[in-house]
């Protein structure tokens, strides 16, 4: 069945049980699937191979990582297909102020985690909450006279000045306090391949844009609190940048791009966190 998957129901089986049988009887893995195979089939195939190898006590991370890479690439392809054209939409003395609550997950947690939710769907019940009557996640975006991007974090006491596309693209740097705004800037079109226009440098793009940019973050609740902090902060950053850059993303688009942003950061996780804070 595995060798003849195109005409069989192999990848519709319980692949956890199938992997157990392959390991139990020491069966050889089927031939790798071609790149023309459906994306979800290729993801399932790699997770199946990873589980078989794991049960046999063999190296399996390569297959597992490939499965998540395929899922990440499949999601980010939608962002590349819809390139952005950011333009300054505020006056020099104006500030865009984004604020969001966090959320409490009442039921259904982890049913929103891929690839499970892609096959089975997910159902999660959330409620949005504030901290002492105020939204605990806040983002400020304002023009900067110099053609650079200044990133600040009030709660972390950190600052970084970004002057090149390479520095924007460096959002996967371990321990960086500005991974989220950098990835958000990429999705907003401040990176070759994500913009409808082509520029030699970030400075040239900012000159065409009309100003530099200063982004300030404030999170009164730490990441890892279980309240969807990172995801909702990402949505707040994306929403503020959208208003500042005239991208006109609605709430559903912002939440969808948050999913893509988290895939860019390779943090993964569930897909409903941001909805609990944005759709209220």
Regions found by a protein language model. Give the residues of each.
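Short, conserved phosphate/pyrophosphate- and ester-handling motifs at nucleotide-, phospho-/glycolipid
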Residues: 230
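Active-site signature of alpha/beta-hydrolase-fold catalytic machinery across serine-
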Residues: 236
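ATP-binding N-lobe of GHMP and related small-molecule kinases
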Residues: 4-227, 239-251, 256, 280
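Alpha/beta catalytic cores of group-transfer enzymes, especially the acyltransferase/condensing modules
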Residues: 249-280
């Amino acid at each position: 069945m595995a060798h003849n998957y195109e005409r069989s129901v192999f990848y519709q089986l319980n692949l956890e049980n199938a992997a157990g049988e392959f390991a139990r009887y020491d069966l050889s893995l089927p031939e790798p699937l071609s790149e023309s195979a459906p994306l979800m089939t290729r993801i399932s195939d790699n997770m199946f191979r990873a589980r078989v190898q794991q049960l046999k006590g063999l190296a399996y991370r390569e297959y597992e990582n490939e499965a998540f890479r395929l899922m990440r690439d499949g999601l980010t392809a939608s962002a590349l297909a819809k390139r952005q054209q950011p333009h300054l939409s505020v006056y020099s003395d104006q500030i865009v102020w984004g604020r969001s609550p966090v959320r409490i997950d009442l039921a259904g947690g982890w049913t929103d985690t891929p690839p499970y939710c892609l096959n089975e769907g997910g159902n999660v019940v959330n409620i949005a909450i504030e901290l002492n009557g105020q939204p605990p996640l806040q983002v400020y975006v304002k023009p900067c006279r110099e053609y650079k991007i200044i990133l600040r974090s009030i709660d972390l006491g950190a600052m970084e000045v970004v002057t090149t596309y390479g520095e924007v693209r460096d959002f996967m740097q371990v321990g960086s306090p500005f991974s989220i705004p950098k990835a958000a800037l990429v999705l907003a079109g401040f990176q070759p391949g994500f913009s409808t226009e082509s520029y030699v440098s970030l400075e040239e793009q900012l000159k065409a844009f009309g100003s530099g940019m200063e982004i300030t973050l404030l999170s009164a609740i730490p990441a890892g609190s279980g309240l969807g902090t990172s995801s909702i902060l990402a949505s707040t950053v994306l929403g503020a940048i959208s208003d500042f850059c005239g991208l006109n993303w609605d709430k559903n688009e912002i939440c969808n791009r948050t999913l893509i942003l988290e895939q860019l950061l390779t943090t993964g996780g569930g897909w409903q966190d941001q909805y609990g804070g944005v759709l209220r």
